[in-house]
């Protein structure tokens, strides 16, 4: 089991939590981004830089994902793709993507895209909060307790 991170938009506080978890649980955490990422020295942490381009990082994450892996992303289509491969998907706010909720999330995303295309301001997500970080940490700890190294 490895943790793959859609790192371009992942909050720094979440990356720091993942770095600590990698060392503590001795699991591989791979950050994928289209820019250089500084990571702490650890045999459990690595960064993969992909060329700039639409969904290039997402495609690499899908390519790397295997059944049972954990993918950290706020990207709904990416979450759907890794779920199709048997991986788990968690957003940086601690919300799980699942077979039960992914279709609804994709539909909502498509509707919001249509509204934006029509010139309607749909706003955006609320700013990342300390509560979001705590929720993420709790969900990550639970996942690692169930699926981490034996």
Curated annotation (Swiss-Prot):
Domain of life: Bacteria
Pfam families: DUF188 (PF02639)
SS bonds (residue pairs): none
InterPro entries linked to this entry: UPF0178
NCBIfam families: PRK00124.1
Family from the record: Belongs to the UPF0178 family.
Protein name (Swiss-Prot/TrEMBL): UPF0178 protein BceJ2315_16760
UniProt source species: Burkholderia cenocepacia (strain ATCC BAA-245 / DSM 16553 / LMG 16656 / NCTC 13227 / J2315 / CF5610)
């Amino acid at each position: 089991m490895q943790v793959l991170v859609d790192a371009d938009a992942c909050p720094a506080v979440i990356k720091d939590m993942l770095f600590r978890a990698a060392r503590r649980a001795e699991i591989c955490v791979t950050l994928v981004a289209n820019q250089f990422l500084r990571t702490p020295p650890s045999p459990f942490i690595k960064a993969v830089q992909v060329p700039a381009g639409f969904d290039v990082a997402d495609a690499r994450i899908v390519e790397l994902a295997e059944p049972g892996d954990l993918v950290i992303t706020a990207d709904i289509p990416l979450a759907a793709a890794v779920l199709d491969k048997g991986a788990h998907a968690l957003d940086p706010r601690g919300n799980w993507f699942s077979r039960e909720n992914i279709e609804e999330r994709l539909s909502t995303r498509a509707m919001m895209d249509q509204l934006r295309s029509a010139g309607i301001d749909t706003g955006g997500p609320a700013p990342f909060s300390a509560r979001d970080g705590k929720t993420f940490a709790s969900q990550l700890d639970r996942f690692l307790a169930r699926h981490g190294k034996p």
